From Swiss-Prot:
Site (Cleavage): A183, T184
Record's subunit section: Heterotetramer of two alpha and two beta chains.
Known EC number: 2.3.1.35, 2.3.1.1
This protein's record includes keyword Protease: no
GO cellular component: cytoplasm
Protein name: Arginine biosynthesis bifunctional protein ArgJ
Similarity comment: Belongs to the ArgJ family.
The keyword Cytoplasm is assigned to this record: yes
Source organism (scientific name): Deinococcus radiodurans (strain ATCC 13939 / DSM 20539 / JCM 16871 / CCUG 27074 / LMG 4051 / NBRC 15346 / NCIMB 9279 / VKM B-1422 / R1)
NCBIfam families (alphabetical): ArgJ, PRK05388.1
Amino acid sequence: MTEPLPDVTFPQGFRAAAMAAGIKPSGKPDLSCVVSERDCAWAFAGTRSTTAAACVTRNRELYASGAPLRALVVNAGVANAATGQQGARDNADMADALASVLAVGEAEVITASTGVIGHLLPMDKVLSGVEHLPEELEGAALPFATAIMTTDTRSKLAHVTLSNGARIVGTAKGSGMIHPDMATMFAFAFTDAQVDQGALRGAFPAIVARTFNAVTVDGDTSTNDMTAVLANGAAGETDLTEFLTALEGVMRDLARQIAADGEGATRLLTVRVTGAASEAEALGAARTCCVSPLLKSAVHGADPNWGRVIMAVGRSGAGVKVEAMKVSVQGVPVFAGGPLNYDAAAVSQSMKTDEVIFDVDLGVGSARGEAWGCDLSAEYVSINADYTT
């Protein structure tokens, strides 16, 4: 996955469009779509927040129907969450507008909105923009990846080619309000692989748990979190095991990109847990470490304060044998049932890099899990103190 971002194109049968419709005050691109020339099998996961946005609610209803998809339309700048029945109508109208232009059914179009909560969509701008979006359809992926951003500092793309030539291209957005429970976080994958929808949907929750649900920036779960994969089958039959492994790799790549681009972040925080009683406990312990303000602050200051790892693991709910527990910082053992002698200054120096890794062995089993976060800087507070003002 080393191809320069500008050169990434969508898999065969998919095209995308992006434009500045005037939703964002900045005038940057804020309305986009991805369209398939063929029906798509799809899998979806949305936020478990009880204040889920209109787009999540509608997508969930469409997902339950089992019907195929043809398109996705996204607006950035307004979340259209906590907007009542008017917000629900506006969301449906956005889908219907694109469906009409594409001559497909409204139920074949899913929607996504991201931005400020509690604001209605400027529907005159949205509908006017959607009407012209298909005129801009192209194969390049970067314009779409850029148009879905809000506080992100960079676009996020990942891609892979399978042995039969089928491709998976994934794109995501997210920088703050990141603590998914399926923070504003979107992740979409598009593939020309032919995969059975039932098998895809059956495997998807576990993949999401190990990737996007293992990311945290600030502990706040968004009203609009969602991830979806669309498969149009244009490349023909594909080995399911190979496909699912590749899909998880793309989603893992995107998850790490989201964590690294956390609001105000200067370092990616990776916590790798082993020796857990179950994968769920391993993931829970790793994620609790990544969301700890104390550990995040230590990472920002390059402080190898491993006691904050012990604290976070202890409150995670994971089973632990302290006498068998081990902790390493940047590969240096610092705890093994008790404190170890180590060169704190050298470890601190090693933490002054793009990624800081903590390895934690819980000492109770053989399960493992990994989570990603970022450091906590003064810039995070500045960004969010001034977000709407």
